Amino acid sequence: MVPALRYLGSVCGRARGIFPGGFSAAHTPASGKSRLLCQGGRRASTSSFDIVIIGGGIVGLASARALILRHPALSIGVLEKEKNLAVHQTGHNSGVIHSGIYYKPESLKAKLCVQGAALIYEYCNQKGISYKQCGKLIVAVEQEEIPRLQALYERGLQNGVQGLRLIQQEDIKKKEPYCRGLMAIDCPYTGIVDYRQVAFSFAKDFQEAGGSVLTNFEVEDIEMARESPSRSKDGMKYPIVIRNTKGEEVRCQYVVTCAGLYSDRISELSGCNPNPRIVPFRGDYLVLKPEKRYLVKGNIYPVPDSRFPFLGVHFTPRMDGNIWLGPNAILAFKREGYRPFDFSARDIMDIIIKSGLIKLVFQNFSYGVNEMYKACFLSATVKHLQKFIPEITISDVLRGPAGVRAQALDRDGNLIEDFVFDGGVGDIGNRILHVRNAPSPAATSSLAISGMIADEVQQRFKL
C-alpha cells in the first residue's frame, strides 16, 4: 500500500439528465428497479464485474474513468444510490478550482490540489468545458491578520502554487474596486467551474470506454458469496456480493467505495473499520442580487482561522453569473439535510453516540454559537461581509442554496483534515478499498486523486 495513503473520500453532486455532448442519462423506471444508466459498450446488462465502484460523485466517477482507461480489459461498474449521478457534495459545492495555498506542506491535500488544479484546467480545455480563471484575493482587513496572511503566503510558495504575490491596498483596489483591505494574497491561478458538468464528462468517458453505471442502487449489504466453488462458477470468479435495499445483487472481484456522506456506514457494512465517523456540516449560502453583481469580480476570501477546516464566509462568482456569499458551517441533523429542519433520528444518534462530536462542541463552543447565530440572522452574515465590501446591505442579498459537507471526526473530537484510504482484513477486507474523508478540495483534486486510487488498486489487488 502506498505509505502516505490513508485519509480520502468521495464527493457527490446533481445530474440533470443529459451529459455534455448530448449523452442522455436514463431515468429510473416507474418500478423503482435499478437499471443501467447509458450502459457501456461491453454488455447490454450485467450483474457481475471485475471491479465495482460504490458512489457516483466526482471522485467515484473520476476513479472509475481512471481504472477503465488503465485496465480496458476489465469489466468495471459504478453503483449509485440516487436516480442520477453527482447528486450531493459535487452538486452543492462552491465550484471553485482551488490553487492549493491553504494546506499543510507535504500533505496529500497540498500535493493533490496543486496537481489536480492543473489537471482540471487541462481536462476542461480538452473537453471544451467552460471555466473562468478569475483568480482569488485572500484579504486581511485587520492588522492582527497580517502575520497569518504572510504565513499563508509562505505556505503557498512551499506548496508550489503558481503566480502568488502579496499586494497592498492600492493593488487590491485595482483587482476588486469595492473591496477594502490592508493587505492581500493575489492567487491568479484560482478559477471556477461547474463540477457537475465535469463529473458528467467523467461518466461519459467511462461509459464510452465500456464501463457501466447502475443507478437507483442503494447498497444495503456487502458479503462473500455463500455458494461453494464446486457449485458456483460465478462464486469462484466473483466472490463478493453487493446487495441493495430491494434485494437486487451485483457480484464482483474487488470493490472501491467512494461513498461520501455514507463512507463510514459503507465501511461498516463490509466488516471494516467505521472510524473515522462522518459528521455532516451544512453550509448555507446567500446570493447577491443581480443589480449588485458589479461589486464582485473574482473570489474574495478572508484570512482563514487555522484552528478550523472551514475557510470562512467568502464571495464566490458562479459560472451562471450569480455571486454566492458564504457559507456558514453548522451541524446538519441529517446526512443529506439541505434545509434547516431536515432531521434523521438515526443520523443524530450516530453523531452523538459514535462520533467525537461532544468533545468537538466543548472544544469550540464559541465558534459553534457564532455560526448558529449567523445561520439564524441574515444581518449577522451581512455584517461580516461588510468588512470586505462595505457597500453591501441586507437588502442586496437573498437566501440561497445549501450544501452538506462530509467531515470525518475521530473519537477525541479531532477533525480529520487530510484524505484517507482504508481497507480491511479477511476475505472481504483484502478485496476492498475504502475512500474515506473527502473534504474540500476533493473536487479540484479529483483527477489527481483518481490516479492515486488507480495506483493503489493496482498494487493492492495485483491487477
From Swiss-Prot:
The modification N6-acetyllysine is found at residues 104, 173. It is found in: Mitochondrion. It catalyses: (S)-2-hydroxyglutarate + A = 2-oxoglutarate + AH2. Its EC number is 1.1.99.2. It comes from the Eukaryota. Belongs to the L2HGDH family. This is L-2-hydroxyglutarate dehydrogenase, mitochondrial. The gene is L2HGDH.
